């Protein structure tokens, strides 16, 4: 039965979609979320604490958290465990947020569970009302005016935790929605907490400095539960090669005086050489070109980087560059937080020889770093008995156990690793990749991965951003790293940055940073109707060594992949 023919599923979906959904908001009232955690925690307690029926891994981070969650899910499934995976946003269908053993939740089971929880919510509200006479509340969960209503994300979490208990999963992987401190997922006691990375995103809510952002994310750490910190190589890489001062020292002598232009010399791409991008053998992991000692020093956290051609320049904005000192400071902050909670602490400083031996593709250096984070979690849960005091039936020896995983399971997961809208190749003729990269750091990470896997390709970026995101930073990265940039907008989505605004941001940025560099300006074009552009692009003969990369948000990635799959 199609989901559109399942009235119970449609009713449950309508109920969820009518809840307050901060994912659709341009500005999120972060300071009001603390009160929300109490009602979620109380409701889960009323339900019998379904989250205590399985091991939980809780993953936060500015970027990389979705990939780490996906890696853990695929590793544990390869090892034979039953796994629940809660992530956001969904790409095509709502049930993708609630995955059990690698598949979206069955729609009928989802609908039945949601209906049951609605009735339990009514009972919970009636009991709460009896105990809190005089407090304004409504029993009807369908009434949007109810001030004490749980939000879309809160309901989604409760549904997920209940589904996982019903499915008797061995382990649940929970991805933080935003931040950590006031995220609904933080009501759960996690057996392992993970901080994948820290960079600039959601600054309005989390703070305008890396330390403030890190503290909000580290608030997920629980007493006696290990913390794995992945802040390091990946963050430093994403933010740039090194701090702004070193960039200036390495700047080309021909850069305009006073402009933030930083050229890194290398061999140019041979535009005449065409490469068959459909041949996966051309997805390479070649060693980098040798560089001078000073430049090698500047790249000490950028191992394996493919050099850019001479006309590539890095448009640096010092306040958004993550330095080596930043990385060390955030690591120490994570260490202190773990110490305060009596939590064992593990920091990822380099990729192990085992993870380094995993296949490429599908693992580029960025994914490899995230796989390293995942394997640290796997190692902890393979040797540590999870907290027995929090589980029902704690006297039962089967209520607490380890999760041993063989290396063969990790290797098998790596060999077939893939995730929707995360460096997802949706077409090979023409070659089109979609990625949900939606901040400066994730754009830089994507471009690094693309250059590693397709070193001789011409990379054309199609960019549509959301209001409130760092469009300037994303454009700056693409100006530095892509061969061509096409600015567009999601015309049917009020959250999309209007194309005229993107054009203005682009013009202002280039005027301020590279006014005399015509090659940068020639990279940029506009596509007022990205749907028409995509249909036309798919219909034309393949560009040989050209790759079209749709970037800027998961919502844009979702739309592009649907159009491409219908067209190609």
In which residue ranges do the predicted regions lie?
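Short functional linear segments
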Residues: 1-61, 68-79, 85-86, 126-147
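Long intrinsically disordered, low-complexity regions that are acidic and Ser/Thr-rich
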Residues: 243-316
């Amino acid at each position: 039965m199609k989901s559109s023919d399942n009235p119970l599923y449609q009713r449950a979906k309508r109920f969820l979609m009518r809840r307050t959904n901060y994912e659709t908001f341009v500005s999120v009232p972060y300071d009001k979320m603390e009160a929300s955690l109490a009602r979620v925690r109380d409701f889960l307690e009323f339900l019998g604490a379904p989250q205590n029926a399985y091991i939980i891994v809780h993953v936060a981070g500015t970027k990389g958290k979705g990939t780490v969650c996906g890696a853990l899910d695929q590793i544990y499934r390869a090892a034979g465990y039953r796994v629940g995976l809660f992530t956001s946003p969904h790409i095509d269908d709502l049930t993708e947020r609630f995955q059990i053993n690698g598949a979206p939740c069955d729609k009928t089971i989802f609908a039945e569970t949601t209906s049951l929880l609605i009735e339990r919510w009514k009972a919970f509200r009636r009991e709460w009302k009896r105990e809190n006479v005089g407090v304004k509340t409504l029993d009807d969960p369908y009434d949007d005016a109810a001030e004490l209503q749980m939000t879309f994300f809160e309901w989604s979490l409760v549904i997920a935790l209940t589904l996982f208990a019903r499915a008797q999963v061995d382990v649940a992987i929970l991805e933080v929605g935003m931040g950590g401190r006031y995220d609904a997922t933080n009501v759960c006691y996690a057996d392992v907490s993970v901080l994948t990375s820290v960079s600039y995103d959601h600054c309005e809510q989390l703070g305008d400095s890396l330390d403030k952002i890190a503290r909000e994310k580290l608030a997920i750490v629980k007493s006696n539960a290990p913390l794995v910190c992945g802040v390091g190589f990946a963050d430093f890489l994403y933010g740039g090669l090194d701090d702004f001062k070193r960039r200036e020292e390495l700047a080309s002598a021909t850069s305009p005086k006073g402009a933030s232009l930083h050229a890194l010399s290398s061999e140019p791409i041979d535009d005449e050489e065409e490469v068959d991008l459909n041949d996966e053998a051309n997805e390479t992991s070649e060693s980098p070109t040798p560089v001078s000692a000073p430049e090698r020093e500047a790249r000490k956290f950028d191992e394996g980087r493919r050099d850019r051609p001479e006309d590539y320049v890095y448009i640096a904005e010092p306040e958004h560059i993550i330095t080596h000192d930043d990385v060390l400071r955030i690591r120490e902050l994570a260490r202190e937080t773990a110490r305060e909670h009596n939590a064992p602490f593990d920091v990822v400083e380099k990729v192990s020889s085992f993870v380094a031996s995993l296949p490429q593709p599908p693992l580029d250096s960025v994914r490899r770093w995230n796989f390293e984070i995942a394997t640290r979690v796997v190692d902890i849960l393979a040797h540590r008995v999870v907290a027995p005091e929090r589980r029902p039936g704690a006297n039962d020896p089967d209520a607490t156990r380890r999760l041993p995983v063989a290396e063969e399971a990790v290797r098998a997961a790596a060999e077939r690793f893939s995730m929707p809208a995360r460096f997802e190749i949706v077409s090979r003729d023409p070659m089109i990749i979609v990625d949900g990269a939606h901040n400066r750091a994730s754009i830089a990470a994507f471009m690094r991965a693309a250059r590693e896997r397709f070193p001789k390709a011409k990379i054309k970026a199609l960019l549509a951003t959301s209001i409130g995101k760092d469009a300037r930073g994303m454009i700056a990265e693409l100006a530095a790293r892509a061969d061509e940039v096409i600015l567009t907008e999601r015309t049917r989505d009020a959250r999309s940055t209007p194309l005229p605004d993107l054009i203005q941001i682009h013009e202002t940025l280039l005027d301020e940073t590279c006014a005399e560099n015509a090659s940068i300006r020639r990279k940029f074009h506009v596509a007022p109707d990205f749907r028409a552009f995509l249909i036309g692009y798919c219909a034309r003969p393949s560009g040989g060594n050209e790759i079209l990369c749709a970037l800027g948000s998961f919502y844009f990635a979702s739309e592009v992949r649907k159009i491409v799959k219908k067209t190609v």
